[in-house]
From Swiss-Prot:
It is an enzyme of class 2 (transferase). It comes from Wolbachia pipientis subsp. Culex pipiens (strain wPip). GO terms for biological process: mRNA catabolic process; RNA processing. This is Polyribonucleotide nucleotidyltransferase. Residues 618-686 form the S1 motif domain. It is found in: Cytoplasm.
Amino acid sequence: MFEIIKKSIDWEGRTLSLETGKIARQADGSVVVNYGDTSILVTVVRKKKEESVDFLPLNVQFIAKSYAMGKIPGGFFKREGKPSDRETLISRVIDRSIRPLFPEGFHDEISVVCNLLTYDTVNSPEVPALIGTVAALAISGVPFHFTIAGVMVGCDENNNYILNPSVQEMKASNLDLFLSGDENSILMVESEVKELSEENVLNAIKFGHEHLQPVIKLIKEFADTVGNKPESFAPVDISDITQELEKYRKDFEEAYSKTVKQERVQALEVVRNNILNTLKEAGKDEKLITYAVKSFERSLVREMIRRKSVRIDSRKYDEIRQIEIEADILPKTHGSALFTRGSTQALVVTALGTTQDEQIVDDIEGDRREHFMLHYNFPPFAVGEASAIRAPGRREIGHGKLAWKAIHPVLPDKSEFPYTIRVVSEIMESDGSSSMATVCGTSIALMDTGVPIKAPVAGIAMGLIKDKNEHIILSDILGDEDYLGDMDFKVAGTSEGITALQMDMKIPGISFEIVEKSLEQAKVGRLHILEKMNAVISEHRKDIKDHVPRVLSFYIDKDKISAAIGTKGKNIRSVCERSNAKIEIGDDGKVSVFAISSTEAEAAKNMMIDSITELEQGSIIDAKVVKIEKSIVELELLNGRKGKMHISEVANQHVESIEDILKQGDTFKALIIDFEKGGCPKLSRRRVDQETGEFFEGKLYNEERRDGLNNRDNYYNNSFNKKPEDNYHSNRPTRPRSGFSNRSRPKFGNNDSSSGFY
């Protein structure tokens, strides 16, 4: 029934296998790729174009179902919802690797679906997903004539490179690099780096490329065994349209000579509309006209750059656009910056929060909490378009994650800066490299906030014009240079090293020589931008702004955590309500207090410490009147505990009625003189000097009455321990009428001199 074909290799100690013929046989190409115990089903389906289009409708989806990790989805419906950021990012990595390899002019709809079947939590799925995609394309019959593979590279503390590091190895790695390539060239790079040098990063790329070769050989052998060869493809002949476009060469050159983006866009629109109207009247297909115009413009601009040795906006190849920087542009925010580079502008705003504001990420490795968030927004008005603002798409998620990777290596440890940090980058206008403007703006905004980052970070996008054996590398590319060029190579880092890389190609790969030159030229540009940034703000604020919540951290014993939280959170809620602060308690006993002011934070700290401090006989504490009965006052101690006080302990004088001295809500200092059997403290107000808060040293009222002191104590104790249903008068002890046994002060609690307090 099944005609199964399977090929496998031992790839650096782990088995990598490709299999087809058993699952999803109705797809044009279907491959199950296994790497370790991680298994992914990749399917490719092609739909013949029914109408001419001027782009490649390629759709790549990586899907991680919960069952692959042995979990049931949360929520009411218990089904997977929209793609997670991780799924989106993996989909983008695959798309960016294979898109340049389809033949020019091929516009059939291609659907690539990567289903994660099982995940071993050791081998990350990015690598096998790309390998399976290339293998499925190779046997699908689609005109895909290149064989590439992907690999991940890590780097340990001794600068030893690690091939496809495990999840645990990657957590300790100085480098998180994913690259794809063929036998001779590099096609795509995505990386987060902990300030490594250009040389180290280049060596890591070479290391990864070297270890791609066995996989490329495996895919070729697998495809040859299956025998379904890619079909040949001949692009639509547009030579007649191209010949007509030569009449408009001068018009295009004049339009592209305008250095201001808005003027250039308007001039180009006039030329394009003129061409479209003229050629449509001549009976040419509108889609083919549009495709031919794009191809013509691409050749024209590249030729202009080579011929004139200057770029569209008259800059030199390595020249950076004019930069304007402002910090603290929005004073009432926690931190802000406006970064403008040419016609690209990013408004970046930060907000600080508590641990409760952390993002809970449902990742394939399990739930985790993220205390640093960076969100990138690209509204239509940034490029002069009139359309609705929608939810963030793949591009916005990808650009935000790239900026996150660039900033993450320089952030302080949570123990050093206990805030949750959210950064939002609003792109106000764009003419290329808006993600790198986000990196620069984020660095400035964080320093304006007072976040102690290790060093400022800047980013730059590099471009490429390649013609046979000649190439030109461009620094700080415009949007048109990105669109019409061969490469978009984004590099971010500090003055000491690289923190993030992202390279996308429009052609089937570049050499190590071009990668090396691009990195070196990017370093020069990055240092120039950092110099401009440092002239505005070079280090973080020494203190956060007045309206930013304060954080006070301290530790309590682990065995006190339960008491600090209280039954169903009663104690911690009480302290938060009384102090107007937020309190978080970690498993290690660390208590973090967030309050508007340092005073409130200190007050909350004291309340929390008081609430877990054991009450001791003889201690003087604050008390508040909660309820007054005929002879008993119910008190709330300011540590959240309850207490009681007899009428005889209210004042150092005869008291007919408690209300004559105290009212509900009054606060005062009280002495703990004993405890009931249930632990409720008995208190005395008269034994404390209310002015000084110290033990009263003077003569107490009626202390000369020697007889009846024991009876008085019994009366005191019996009154506290009365049941509510007992009749007060029937149980009232008889006051002694006469007799003095001695002149010593009465002892409370146990009649033992070692435990009594005076």
